[in-house]
Regions:
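Membrane-interface helix-loop-helix junctions at transmembrane boundaries of multi-pass membrane enzymes
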Residues: 7-13, 278-281, 321-332, 397-413
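Membrane-interface alpha helices of multi-pass inner-membrane proteins
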Residues: 243-250, 282-301, 307-311
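Short acidic/glycine- and proline-prone juxtamembrane loop motifs at membrane-interface regions
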Residues: 247, 251-259
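Transmembrane-helix signature of polytopic, membrane-embedded enzymes
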Residues: 175, 182-244
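C-terminal luminal/periplasmic domains and tails of membrane-associated envelope-modifying transferases
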Residues: 488-645
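Start-transfer (signal-anchor) and selected internal transmembrane alpha helices
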Residues: 1-21, 47-115, 333-337
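Membrane-lumen/periplasm interface segments of specific transmembrane helices
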Residues: 22-37, 295, 309-312, 316-399
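Hydrophobic, aromatic-rich transmembrane alpha-helices
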Residues: 63-71, 386-420, 442
Length: 645
């Protein structure tokens, strides 16, 4: 007697739904859900032409990848492999430039602004001022909290890259001098560009080149790693898929993109160690794996989990291969790996006086001070890196590779779970966990390649289509880096008819002039309002110091009792004075709120400029009434009674 058939789902269809539905849901949320339910980051409508350029570039690369993979032999010659990796490198840089163009009218200028900025890369500001390396290392932990928001939470490795750039360029002062006219205006977001010499400025260009080269060397190591596991076709697929993941394209100038090098180098060395358990090269591989982890943690303490990925992968592979039959050998290799990691740190402590414990405690204290709700972020943390590593590949690497690559799947999933549950991250995991991305891509390529080397082209085409769509929407809409505005793109404002004109000037030679302002005359206690200032840079060269604007509304010229106290970087924090162009007019709006207990009457409006870093006020060159380098505006600020109709 026939049994009634139940409803069954075709396994391939189930896999496609698992891979595709999260991506489609995410793209839908990006486009139509303005809340942050599924999308953590801020969003903005992209300009049409740059978005079309990016989408075209992604589609072209996808087509090239499919065409190449359809024609690749099972085994590549060294020339074929080199040509393929050269293409991936060039395609990656080109796609990165197109992605940067979404938010930067001039992408190369934008990369420079990011590199020098206190608000983004952040490391340049520290690195260029390191003259005595050993002395700086000795006092590093004491100075960390005086650094900007990024450098204060990291070990000294990244500033040392810029120190290296300075040392390499010192013997070539003519080259640095030739670059200076181009680079100095691009360093204006450093806030103190006037204090940088030509060689230090050129070191910023060195940093841009090194970061870009390092970021697009990741698919090269990815090829090497996957080649060891599954052959040339899977390796080629992994390298070709990597430029389609959003995080590799939109974090230009952020060193986190390159931290996947440490993940891959560790895994490659683990494989080398396993392949030669009792030979010298196996022990050497273990030591160098530890050394790679040292370099990774020297760049960022946040790279410590790479040790967990490598350790769990090694243990799982050893168990599968040997069931611990060679445990004394493996224990010795583990000791060598620990020496490779801890030995250089010990040398820095003993020889340079570096305070490792103090630096780590300071970095973690500042990092963990960022408040994030626990349970929402237990889910947000993995979701964020899933979206930046490409949702189709992340779903494959999490759910579908347990049979194809159990050790690697276990290593990365367990590390991800531990990171999320321990709550050591504080948001932005799509950036700071980019060391997971090449592992995710590797697992995706392993699943898309059969054990005998054949490629699953139907699934591959589906995955590439999803990746292309997600990358275009994700990069086009999300806004993850903000440092300010390119001064040459700032429109010249039209002076309003109700402008109150002034002859107020600041700086020793009157380089900064307040052309005028607009403010309404009467306010009530607790009321919010705006004051629009119109500045002009009347000097002939760039301004050497970044100034903030302060606005005080006070009962006396001595500035004792304030009912308004507002300050900020000009143009809504987007344009420090160091970026103002000679002759440029700046519209600078400030929003304020009158104190709720303000008494009715007339008040003075005092304005001025002060150094962002020291707090010292700028010299008042011209003003009718000035007290303590603050200028009283001609208009009076009137607070009306709350009972007044």
């Amino acid at each position: 007697m026939k049994q009634p058939r139940g409803i069954s789902l075709n396994p391939k269809l189930g896999q496609m739904l698992l891979i595709g539905l999260p991506t489609l849901a995410y793209i839908t949320a990006l486009l139509f859900d303005s809340s942050r339910t599924v999308v953590l980051w801020e969003r903005s409508a992209p300009p049409a032409a740059p978005l079309a350029l990016l989408a075209t570039g992604l589609a072209l690369h996808s087509a090239v990848a499919l065409a190449l993979l359809a024609r690749l032999p099972r085994t590549l010659s060294s020339k074929q492999a080199a040509a393929l990796l050269a293409y991936v490198f060039v395609a990656g840089v080109a796609l990165q430039t197109a992605a940067t163009h979404i938010v930067e009218p001039f992408p190369l200028r934008g990369l420079a602004f990011r590199q020098y900025s206190d608000f983004t890369g952040g490391y340049f500001t520290v690195g260029v001022r390191v003259d005595d390396l050993w002395g700086w290392l000795a006092r590093f932990s004491q100075e960390m909290e005086s650094y900007n928001v990024h450098a204060e939470r990291h070990p000294p490795g990244l500033p040392m890259i810029f120190w290296l750039g300075v040392q390499l360029l010192r013997p070539f002062p003519e080259l640095a001098a030739a670059l200076e006219p181009t680079l100095r205006p691009l360093a204006c977001f450093d806030l103190r560009p006037g204090e940088l010499d030509a060689v230090q400025l050129a070191a910023g260009l060195f940093g841009i080149l090194i970061e870009t080269i390092a970021a697009w060397s990741v698919p090269i190591l990815l090829f090497v790693f996957v080649q060891r596991l599954a052959g040339d076709r899977a390796a080629a697929m992994a390298a070709l898929l990597y430029p389609l993941i959003p995080g590799a394209l939109m974090w230009a100038s952020q060193w986190d993109r390159s931290f996947g090098l440490f993940s891959l180098a560790t895994l490659i060395l683990v494989e080398a160690m396993l392949a030669a358990p009792v030979r010298p090269r196996g022990f050497a591989a273990a030591f160098f794996a530890g050394l790679v982890l040292f370099l990774g943690t020297l760049m960022s303490f946040g790279n410590l989990p790479i040790a967990m990925i490598g350790g769990l992968y090694a243990l799982a592979r050893i168990w599968a291969l040997e069931q611990l039959r060679l445990w004394p050998v493996r224990l010795a290799q583990g000791v060598l790996a620990f020496i490779g990691l801890a030995g250089p740190w010990a040398a820095l402590v003993l020889l340079a006086g570096f305070d490792l414990r103090g630096s780590y405690e300071t970095a973690m204290r500042l990092h963990l001070a960022l408040e994030r709700d626990y349970w929402p972020f237990v889910l947000w943390h993995p979701w964020d890196i899933f979206t930046f590593a490409g949702l189709p590949l992340a779903m494959i690497a999490t759910c579908l590779t347990w049979q194809r690559a159990p050790a690697l799947t276990f290593a990365w999933v367990a590390t991800l779970a531990a990171q999320s549950l321990l709550h050591v991250a504080r948001g932005e995991t799509g950036r700071v966990w980019m060391y997971f991305a090449p592992v995710i891509v590797a697992l995706g390529s392993l699943w898309l390649t059969r054990r005998e080397g054949a490629i699953r082209f139907a699934q591959l085409s589906f995955v590439i289509g999803l990746l292309t769509a997600q990358a275009a929407a994700h990069i086009g809409l999300l806004r993850v880096i903000g440092y300010g505005a390119d001064p040459i793109t700032v429109p010249r404002p039209t002076l309003p008819a109700n402008l109150v004109s002034t002859e107020i000037r600041f700086e020793p030679n009157g380089e900064i002039r307040l052309l005028g302002y607009v403010i309404k005359q009467t306010f009530r206690p607790g009321e919010s309002g705006t004051i629009d200032l119109y500045w002009r840079h009347e000097g002939e060269t760039f301004l050497p110091r970044a100034r903030k604007v302060f606005i005080h509304v006070t009962d006396t010229l001595e500035d004792r009792e304030r009912i308004v106290n507002q300050d900020g970087r000009p143009a809504n924090w987007t344009l420090p004075t160091t970026c103002w162009l000679p002759g440029q007019v700046i519209h600078d709006r400030h929003i304020f709120t009158v104190a709720g207990d303000a008494q009715p009457g007339e008040y003075y409006v005092l304005i001025g400029l002060y150094d962002e870093l020291t707090g010292e006020r700028a010299f008042v060159h011209t003003a009718q009434v000035a007290v303590a380098n603050a200028v009283a505006l001609p208009s009076r600020f009137v607070v009306a009674s709350l009972n007044r109709e």
